Structure formats: structure tokens, C-alpha cells
Amino acid sequence: MNNMSLSDIFERFDTSKDGKISWEEFRDAIHALSPSIPSEKLVEMFIQLDTNGDGQVDAAKFASCMDQTAQSSGGDVEKELKDAFKLYDINCDGKISANELHVVMTRLGEKCTVESCVGMVQAIDVDGDGYIRFVGV
């Protein structure tokens, strides 16, 4: 994914740049990386990771969560990410727009606005062109 490490991904979603991600940042990160995870599972994961109850998850806890996600998906995170990318890339042009993200998330039953999807895209848009790309898809 543009050669991004877990720490790069964490930093992209740490919009407040305080070294921790809030529930909203966590939810957006996991949904962007693994859209098939149900909301109830996300809440459960966040509660388990937020061991001190401060409503924040640090980079180490986030990495642990991603490792657990990889193990539960059979260990092939890259394949899962590629499959998720293809799901969101509605017009198959190799990039995901905020509108495509909104359409798919709405179909998956998520209540979100186009504006919130613009924010999610901006959070992980590597080159600032308004799209998410997955190199090698």
C-alpha cells in the first residue's frame, strides 16, 4: 500500500498528531483497512485496546490490533487490503474517491456523509490528489 508501514498508517489516522488515536480515528482507520469488520467488533476491539480507559489507543496497541486482524483473516493482510480496495474502487480506475467510499460505506450500512468520507480520504491520501491508491492492485 504505497509501501506504508503500520506506523505510517497510524500516523495518517492520528489526525490530532498526539501519538494516540481516538475512537473516531480508530474506527476510520480500521474501516478503511478492513471494511468487512462489523461495527460491534470494532467497539469490542477498541475497548480491549483501551486498557486504561482514556479513550485513546497508542501506536503499539494499534499494531497489536492489526496483528490480531491479520491472524483472524488467515494472516494474509495484503490480500485482504487488496480485496477491500477493489470493493471500494467502483469504477475500477485504480483509485478510490470520497464519493466511491461514501457509496460503498452506505451500502455496507454505515451512516456517513460525503464530507466525512472526504476527511477519511484526505487522512490517507499520500500525494494529496484527493484519491486513495493501492500500488500493485
From Swiss-Prot:
User: Is Repeat one of the keywords UniProt gives this record?
Assistant: yes
Binding locations of Ca(2+) 1: D14, S16, D18, K20, E25
Molecular function via GO: calcium ion binding
Keyword Lipoprotein found: no
What region holds the EF-hand domain?
A: 1-36, 37-72, 76-111, 112-137
Task: Show the InterPro entries listed in the entry.
Answer: EF-hand-dom_pair, EF_Hand_1_Ca_BS, EF_hand_dom, EF_hand_pair_protein_CML-like
Query: In which residues is Ca(2+) 2 bound?
Result: D89, N91, D93, K95, E100
Q: Which UniProt keywords apply?
A: Calcium, Metal-binding, Repeat
Lineage, top-rank taxon, reads Eukaryota
One Pfam family named in its UniProt record:
EF-hand_5
Q: What does this protein do?
A: Potential calcium sensor.
> Could you identify this protein by its name?
Probable calcium-binding protein CML33
Species this chain originates from: Arabidopsis thaliana (Mouse-ear cress)
